[in-house]
């Protein structure tokens, strides 16, 4: 995979940025704000469109070339001025060479009138790496999805429809690789009959190429040193060009749920709380059902979890999900209390054998240093603060999180009602509503239900066939000592140990595929202490573990929930039996695509199977569920969303000839 690097920038005598890669300016040095507003806001008629948005309505803008974010900030400023209080702005922008935080801060300082919005962007502009990166502002009122990479690689992965386009980027003469018929075809694919477009260039071949792609473009007077600019509207896909292939029916979007915007989310762990918040921020009224007294009482209840990116150098779906999810979670954590709720202390993965050394070398070659880099033994010891057995791979933006803090913060939204001490046992579909029953008691009903209760969702007949499995894990809590305060980073080998939180270190974690007993046991505590010794004999000594009697060892056990392919299970659920009947032909020829609408269980969704990566993947998957339900652009590449789709297991069962057998068991 290609390493994404930051933009290379020179600054002129007036402090204006200029791209070294393209030998071009980011904006007019004379009238940058005026040009942005004229070319993109005026030509897309955004003042009127923002003003006329319905309460709860939204407008989605797509952009080529995020650059300094000037266009985004101007659009946000106008939206904030004109739109109804409950309207939403979604902005999707592709950028090959993102600015570093320092360069972005310096560039935006040129526009003091945008500072209220620029400050929020800078606060959230962390962990912006390759792929889809979701940034959320103003309590979800404004959403920015950055597609970090080449436009012709990123836009084909985007699943959504834009209301307006900002066709920006460096001038065609400076950046000819972007201004191509292939790009314009992607803009057309992502447009509807009411989509508008504005661009600063009035070059004839650009206008003709956009017309050929299905837009109707015209030249209009420019502003400043731009004599003319282009504006247009998408009319229709060209008759002489083959339509882009539609999504296979078992992966297509279900029809939108009309009527009451109410949802029930079952399970108040990381996945459930994230899903509830994502829906609540979009105006849904959410009932969050939890069988315990409070959120985060099971696997999400550990005192410290590690933000550790187990990546692949080969750009797998799981690796893409982890990279996007890590960035999203890191940005969420910026709003919590550092040092108590979380800490970006970095994560060091030790090189504990030759196989791990090779894996780390491949990762270091595949990703930028700002995400991960190799440290030799002396550097690793200097970074961690303790003596180690080896060097390793350091993730400077990683750290530890107190998962309950994140869950409670997300569940605190005013549109969320927590229903505690309530175990959901059965789902019934009655009059276009899902009813949740506990024994013979009707708990609540809504047109939408999201199952987020880890492997417990298998108790419902509608999701009983999902191949989820439990893996028991036990952590050990060790009291901080004066000597153990030297530990400055999370350190991992086969296990992990984190710097102290509120006077205790967390050490873990065991993996037990057979036990169903959640009582902490001495054997696993001793195994965890063995993992600690593999990490650092020095730290083991600093923690005075030799002086601890077995009865003093404290900890907790919980079940991780994972799937056979280690990807989470996220998306809409189908009727299993009807699915097998509808697509039975795939059992004879897997290349067939029967023209049969998927038999969805209308309004029933799942967000589960996050394993030990829940801190990284569950919050972004909450956004994915909300995007499915509200027909928004997906916050992940389409291929990644499809790789996480619940239907993948039934589909594999058909193709492998297993018929109605439960896949994965």
From Swiss-Prot:
Compartment list: Cytoplasm
EC number(s) stated in the UniProt entry for this protein: 2.1.1.61, 1.5.-.-
A matching Pfam family: Methyltransf_30
Region (tRNA (mnm(5)s(2)U34)-methyltransferase): 1-235
Region (FAD-dependent cmnm(5)s(2)U34 oxidoreductase): 266-665
GO cellular component terms given for this protein: cytoplasm
Disulfide partners: none
GO molecular function list: flavin adenine dinucleotide binding; oxidoreductase activity, acting on the CH-NH group of donors; tRNA (5-methylaminomethyl-2-thiouridylate)(34)-methyltransferase activity
Cofactor(s) in the UniProt record: FAD
Reaction it catalyzes: 5-aminomethyl-2-thiouridine(34) in tRNA + S-adenosyl-L-methionine = 5-methylaminomethyl-2-thiouridine(34) in tRNA + S-adenosyl-L-homocysteine + H(+)
Keyword set, alphabetical order: Cytoplasm, FAD, Flavoprotein, Methyltransferase, Multifunctional enzyme, Oxidoreductase, S-adenosyl-L-methionine, Transferase, tRNA processing
GO biological-process terms attached to the record: methylation; tRNA wobble uridine modification
Function: Catalyzes the last two steps in the biosynthesis of 5-methylaminomethyl-2-thiouridine (mnm(5)s(2)U) at the wobble position (U34) in tRNA. Catalyzes the FAD-dependent demodification of cmnm(5)s(2)U34 to nm(5)s(2)U34, followed by the transfer of a methyl group from S-adenosyl-L-methionine to nm(5)s(2)U34, to form mnm(5)s(2)U34.
Family to which the UniProt record says this protein belongs: In the N-terminal section; belongs to the methyltransferase superfamily. tRNA (mnm(5)s(2)U34)-methyltransferase family.
HAMAP family according to UniProt: MnmC
Record-given protein name: tRNA 5-methylaminomethyl-2-thiouridine biosynthesis bifunctional protein MnmC
Organism: Pseudomonas syringae pv. syringae (strain B728a)
Gene: mnmC
């Amino acid at each position: 995979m290609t390493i994404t690097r930051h933009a290379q920038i020179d600054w002129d005598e007036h402090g204006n940025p200029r791209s070294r890669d393209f030998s071009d300016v980011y904006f007019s040095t004379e009238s940058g704000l005026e040009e942005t507003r004229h070319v993109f806001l005026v030509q897309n008629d955004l003042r009127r469109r923002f003003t006329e948005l319905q309460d709860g309505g939204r407008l989605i803008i797509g952009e080529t070339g995020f650059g300094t974010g000037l266009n985004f900030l101007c659009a946000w400023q106008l939206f904030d001025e004109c739109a109804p209080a409950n309207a939403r702005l979604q902005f999707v922008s592709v950028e090959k060479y993102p600015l570093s935080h320092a360069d972005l801060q310096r560039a935006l300082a040129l526009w003091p009138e945008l500072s209220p919005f620029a400050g929020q962007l800078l606060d959230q502009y962390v962990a912006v790496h390759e792929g889809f990166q979701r940034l959320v502002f103003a309590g979800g009122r404004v959403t920015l999805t950055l597609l970090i990479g080449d436009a012709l690689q990123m836009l084909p992965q985007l699943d959504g429809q834009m209301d307006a386009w900002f066709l920006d980027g460096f001038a065609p003469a400076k950046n000819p690789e972007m201004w191509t018929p292939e790009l314009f075809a992607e803009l057309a694919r992502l447009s509807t009959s009411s989509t508008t477009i504005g661009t600063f260039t009035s070059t004839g071949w650009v206008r003709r190429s956009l017309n050929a792609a299905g837009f109707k473009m015209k030249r209009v007077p420019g502003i400043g040193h731009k004599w003319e600019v282009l504006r247009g509207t998408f009319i229709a896909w060209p008759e002489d060009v083959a339509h882009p292939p539609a999504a296979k029916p078992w992966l297509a979007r279900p029809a939108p749920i009309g009527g009451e915007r109410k949802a029930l989310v079952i399970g108040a762990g990381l996945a459930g709380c994230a899903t509830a918040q994502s829906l609540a921020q979009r105006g849904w009224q959410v009932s969050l059902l939890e069988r315990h007294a409070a959120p985060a009482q099971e696997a999400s209840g550990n005192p410290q979890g590690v933000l550790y990116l187990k990546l692949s150098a080969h750009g797998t779906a799981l690796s893409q999900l982890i990279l996007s999810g890590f960035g999203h979670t890191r940005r969420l954590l910026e709003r919590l209390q550092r040092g108590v709720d979380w800490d970006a202390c970095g994560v060091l993965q030790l090189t504990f054998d030759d196989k791990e050394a090779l894996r780390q070398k491949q990762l270091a070659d595949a990703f930028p240093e700002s995400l991960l880099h190799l440290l030799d033994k002396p550097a690793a010891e200097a970074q961690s603060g303790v003596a180690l057995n080896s060097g390793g791979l350091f993730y400077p933006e990683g750290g530890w999180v107190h998962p309950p803090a994140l869950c409670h913060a997300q569940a605190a939204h005013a549109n969320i009602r927590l229903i505690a001490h309530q175990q959901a046992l059965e789902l019934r579909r009655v009059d276009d509503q899902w009813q949740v029953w506990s024994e013979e008691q009707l708990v609540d009903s809504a047109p939408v239900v999201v199952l987020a209760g880890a492997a417990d969702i298998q108790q419902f007949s509608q999701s009983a066939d999902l191949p989820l499995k439990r893996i028991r894990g036990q952590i050990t809590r060790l009291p901080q000592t004066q000597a153990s305060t030297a530990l400055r980073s999370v350190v991992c080998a086969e296990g992990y140990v984190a710097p102290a939180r509120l006077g205790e270190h967390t050490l873990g974690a065991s993996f037990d595929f057979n036990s169903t007993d959640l009582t902490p046991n001495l054997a696993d505590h001793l195994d965890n202490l063995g993992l600690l010794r593999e990490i650092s004999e020095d730290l083991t000594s600093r923690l005075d573990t030799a002086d601890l009697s077995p009865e003093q060892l404290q900890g907790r056990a919980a079940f991780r929930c994972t799937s056979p392919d280690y990807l989470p299970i996220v998306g809409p659920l189908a009727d299993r039996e009807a699915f097998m009947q509808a697509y039975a032909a795939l059992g004879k020829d897997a290349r067939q695509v029967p023209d049969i609408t998927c038999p969805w269980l209308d309004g029933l969704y799942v967000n589960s199977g996050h394993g030990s990566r829940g801190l990284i993947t569950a919050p972004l998957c909450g956004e994915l569920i909300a995007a499915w339900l509200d027909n928004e652009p997906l916050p992940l590449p389409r291929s990644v969303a499809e790789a996480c789709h619940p239907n993948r297991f039934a589909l594999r069962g058909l193709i492998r000839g297993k018929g109605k057998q439960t896949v994965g068991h």
